Amino acid sequence: MKRNGTRLNFAKANSTKSGSTRARDLMNKMSIIPEWHSLYSNTRKLPCSRPHSSPCKMQRTIFQDLCRPSSSTTAIANPVLSYLDIERILAQKISSRRDDIKKVFQILDRNHNQMVTKGDLKRVITAFLIPLTKDQFQDLLAQIPISSLGNVPYLEFLSRFGGGIDININGIKRVNENEVDNRRTVKEVQLTEKIFRNMRSIRKVFQVMDVNNTGLVQPQELRRVLETFCLRMQDGDYEKFLEQYNIDKTTAVDYNAFLKNLSVKNDASFKYLLSNAAELSRETQQGKNGKRLLDTGSSEDVWKNYSLDDLEKTFCQEFSKSYEKIEKALSAGDPSKGGYISLNYLKVVLDTFIYRLPRRIFIQLIRRFGLKTSTKINWKQFLTAIYERQKLEVSKTLPLKKRSSTEARNRSRKENIIKKLFKYSEDRYTALKKTLLIISSTPSGHITWEELRHILNCMVAKLNDSEFSELKQTFDPEGTGAVRVNSLLDVLDDSTKVRKMSPSTDTKTPLPVAWDSVEELVLDSITRNLQAFYSMLQSYDLRDTGTIGKNNFRKVMRVFCPYLSNEHLVRFSSKFQEAGSGRILYKKFLLSIGVGIPPPTPPLSSPKVQLSDQFQIEEPGQQDERTQPSGEKTSEINNMTKEEVIDGLKHRIQQKDPVFRKQFLSISKEPDVKINQEEFRKVLERSGMPMNDCQYAMLASKLGFKNEEGMSYQDFTMGFEDCMLSGLETVPLQSRTASRTNMDEHFISAEECLRIFPKKLKESFRDVYSAFFRIDLDRDGIISMHDFHRLLQYLQLNMVDLEFERFLSLLGLRLSVTLNFREFQNLCEKRPWKSDEAPQRLIRCKQKVADSELACEQAHQYLIMKAKTRWADLSKNFIETDNEGNGILRRRDIKNSLYGFDIPLTPREFEKLWQNYDTEGRGYITYQEFLHRLGIRYSPKVHRPYKEDYFNFLGHFTKPKQVQEEIQELQQISEREKLMNHYEEISKAFNAMEKSKPVALCRVQKVLQECGCPLKEEELISLLKSLDVSVHNNHIDPVEFLRALEISWASKARPKEKEESSPPPISFSKVTPDEVIKTMQEVVESSQPALVEAFSALDKEDTGFVKAMEFGDVLRSVCQKLTDNQYHYFLRRLRLHLTPNIHWKYFLENFSTFQDETADDWAENMPKAPPPMSPKETAHRDIVARVQKAVASHYHTIVQEFENFDTLKSNTVSRDEFRSICTRHIQILTDEQFDRLWSELPVNAKGRLKYQDFLSKLSIERVPSPPMAAGDSGESTMAQRGSSAPEFSQGTRSNLYSPPRDSRVGLKSRSHPCTPVGTPPLQNCEPIESRLRKQIQGCWRELLRECKEKDTDKQGTISAAEFLALVEKFKLDISREESQQLIVKYDLKNNGKFAYCDFIQSCVLLLKAKETSLMRRMRIQNADKMKEAGMETPSFYSALLRIQPKIVHCWRPMRRSFKTYDKNGTGLLSVADFRKVLRQYSINLSEEEFFHVLEYYDKSLSSKISYNDFLRAFLQ
């Protein structure tokens, strides 16, 4: 003891001590400390200013610290810890202190029902295990079943979290009963000793029981604690114990004073125990290899006197002692068998079994082992790195002895020999030293002279006989035939003449080393360390390809053959380099040098055993055996007998060893494929069980293995288990007829397979994709049920064919079904389908199936399965119906369904599939025909066309009760329509009744049923309520009921009368040229008001003239299907085909009187040209043109100028401020010119310019088109012209700002369609909504409630006046003009109603675009994927970027709305319908931005928009 303490003090004082001495002192210090820590694990960190002179004194200090009250140190929970970290910590700590914690729970379990309260559980966890936050504790409670009273079963808690690392804590040696003080009984001594052992636990139990922190416990509770943790005592013994420590059993006990008094009274015995513990530790330290070492704390002050080299050596030495436990613990932390664990888990394991290192030093050590600390740790690579480091960095230092004069002379002589030895080459010194270090790590530490000469000839130079004899005489004067390697290393280290050798003046060149000698030396080095060499190569080849990188190959060769020069390495690399990739074929390299591929290392083998196996160097007396070839010797050592192999196989089969199974299946590929005897022998060799021919023949005979029949893995496991049960009698495995019960044990039922399949899949594969990739052998992205069956066999889920079919039926599958990856993933994970995911066809194209017939059959079977099980999903693309309302299917419907379920077909394959359905070639099929082809019976209630649920879109704001009410209302509407269809029968039946008396509901129900309207009682009551018919005591007034029916009938019949009264539209498609003029006169006469309005909109100056092209556009808008030939014929007849400008007023007034006989006179009387303008008018128009051109070319600059002047943010500027802007950007205007320009601008009541209106009117010109002629289909062909720089011609308007009228009209020959009459323009209200968002988010519930109260019809709309009243009531910060913009935007049905649901949704839901990097911004659909793409402008891009979140949020219902308007299924919409859908979903687009969108998606001016191209731009 004294010697150890002196050594520790000396290590502290002498900072210049060598690294090896420090390491030994550290080992001595660490070997003493754990003996006391085994008594008190997890103690607090103790300050250590200097090493203690004796462990007794140090441990007494620790004990005194433990006996102090711990209230001063409050445990703080770590909120960063995840649930997995907490579970791991609990598993570790509970496994080490299970008994103590169980005893604590038993004390707290006063009712003895194995239950504790949640508060008791949390206090026990905080005191004994780890402090938790409230959320962490709630997460932990969620994993435990809780009783109805809220109590927790603590046994369930211990069972659930009691796994993990098995930490065995050894206590100190018990006191011999003969050495007990005579004044105390044996019971008292035993009780005292047990209190010492459980001091910390007992203190924590007292604190747990002391809920109020008073420091007191009741005497009966004190006895319960002592009897639970220590031993049971009789009443007499317990009373003596209380007298010994002055405890009154009638009052509360101060447990802190009790523990302190206990420590003082037993101080002498305590010292004795500590001295015994220290002596035991010092005496048994060298003999115990597997003992764990724990330091006194994690403070870096304890470690600062030790270098990293010393810590690394000591760490490696202690690591080998607990290798098996560490490997088991690391394997337990890798449940997925992926080979990776977290850095924190690795530190917990190493702290448990080796040292509790500070984190900074731990990370430095990990980096020295070649591992990255920023990612997860490959624990197998970590074990290999430590094993290699331990093998190569064995401690070389030996204790120095006093040299005699003879020894000095011998050393001088040896140094002279070494100097002569290295006279040829100095750079060989380091390589020779590394080689000798490897040899010195062997158990014997000797090398024969023949081996040494061989090494010197290869590495240094070829020695002649005289030089070698001199070397041999110097180091081996006794002639033993071998030399100690350490003696050579000693001379190499201490010879300053060798280490500081001056440059040689000898001109003699070094002797070259022969290549044959180098190959022999490499072969010898690799043979000695074959397993380690091959393991290190495999660590760089995780996929077992047989190749590694050139740099990695050099690293491995440098480790095991450090004497190789760069030339040698280049020669080796080039000789075995793969041509294509440049990688090294290391297996070919091993075979070429005659080594061969070694069998894999058996699992859980200790590095110490591996070291002894790899460095088999015998004692000097065994020189004859050393001269034998290394290959024969290795085979003799490694070959196993028949009994050993049978034991090994038995162990592997019982443990279901995955390594052995993988080796077997690597040859057989499948569990049911048979292999022959030679292949089975390879399996044994790869599994670390090599055998010679004789032993293997005996094993095959014992197992009954027949080469002609072969054996599969299933046969082997089943038969080998039978052999184990019967004592391995000689019965052939394949011919064994097992009993029925034994066979049933290996086959499971379909229900059991369904239950354990997800768990097995998770254990065997890293993820679902790995399993899919494993069974998809042809890599076509589709697996069959045969592939699925192979997967079950791979997971050892064996079923008979009948059960497998039942298993598929439970999953909703059949034998003929195929699955793609997404379906397989949903099958395995049961994850919900994301509604906002884009269809797979819009993301990427799938691989095509090569076989056309197989592809069609697979698609057909897939449609059968979906039609049976998921018709609702399949029918999402089936929306078309015929005139009678029956559902029909076209090519695109089935194609979209297949693509939606990721079943892609080539056009040829799909055409073949469609021909099987549409046998008559009509282009469509009915639902009945489609289901008949699928072999499914048609049901009208089930197989209906898909209908979109309107309320799903507003579900964010709609409560479930409200949804139910609205659905009931829709049902009532359909029931009311049924009543209207049978109005006459119902009216006759009720008129026949006696109207003076009320009618019972049951009679009303019966009458309606007789009239063809069967209704349930609940449906009838709700229908009467919707008709405002009162019900009293289940009776109604028949007169009131008839009056309500009459009102509904009249309102329904009125629209039909209007439709019947409207004349059919006139079509010019079948009009002959001779009838064109007459037909045109009829159309012009009937469409006179619309033509006047359209021409007036074009003739801003009221000159009566329009351009000939504009004149033709207007006529085409009212004349359906008017061809160009008919129009040109019409102009020639009117003598107007050469006229650039046409007087439209004259045409409308006199066209009805036109005749061919007076055509010349009629044309001559028409005015020819507009009147000339005055010079002032011309100058003014030029100024207006300059203003518009300046705004178009410097838009952002002018906007910035306006905003700079608008300091009050009122969107207005003064007259002088606007004039300064005109002077700067346009031209200097005279007072007269500016006054005239100012008079045409939008000015408010205060005389300030509203610059927002000014800019919008200049940047875009909107024109309301004339009303359609009677009978028009509603598809507007009118167009809107707008751009950033409008063109000006002779007919430029005189007024810059004219609110009631817009700029001009054009048709598809010049511009895009415009807003039809009655359709409000698009509005961009995003700035208004952004400003209102904060205000409405605080009161949107009250606002929604008010709107619902005003919405009596529950249509989701209120009147504009009611909305303005709510704006005033909630004091929303918007002006009158902004309110009008909102009303226009949210008037979705053009009926003057405000859609409050859409408004609130836009203001409450803050939709943001997905945050992506600059390299992955939103891309617009490529032009090559579209037929024609227009110009890409900044305004176009800014508009798309702004509306992207809204489109992504509602693109699915929007697409279905597009399809509803696209009745012909062409994928194209008219501009009017496209605008309607955008308004329906409240898309924030101004008219200018809408024009840019049209300009891009309708470059050809066809007035048709591809809505798929539009949506695809947002979904990429």
Swiss-Prot record:
InterPro entries associated with the record: EF-hand-dom_pair, EF_Hand_1_Ca_BS, EF_hand_DJBP, EF_hand_dom, EFCB6
Positions of Ca(2+) 4 binding: 1462, 1464, 1466, 1473
Residue positions binding Ca(2+) 2: 210, 212, 214, 221
GO biological process terms on file: flagellated sperm motility
Gene Ontology CC annotation, any one: sperm flagellum
Keyword terms: Calcium, Cell projection, Cilium, Cytoplasm, Cytoskeleton, Flagellum, Metal-binding, Nucleus, Phosphoprotein, Repeat, Repressor, Transcription, Transcription regulation
Pfam family for this entry, one: EF-hand_5
UniProt keyword Glycoprotein, yes or no: no
Sites of Phosphothreonine modification: 906, 1315, 1319
Residues the entry annotates as binding Ca(2+) 1: 109, 111, 113, 115, 120
Ranges of biased composition (kind: Polar residues): 12-21, 628-638, 1274-1297
UniProt superkingdom: Eukaryota
PANTHER family: EF-HAND CALCIUM-BINDING DOMAIN-CONTAINING PROTEIN 6, EF-HAND CALCIUM-BINDING DOMAIN-CONTAINING PROTEIN 6-RELATED
Complex formation: Microtubule inner protein component of sperm flagellar doublet microtubules. Binds PARK7. Part of a ternary complex containing PARK7, EFCAB6/DJBP and AR.
Name recorded for this polypeptide: EF-hand calcium-binding domain-containing protein 6
Biological classification of the source: Eukaryota, Metazoa, Chordata, Craniata, Vertebrata
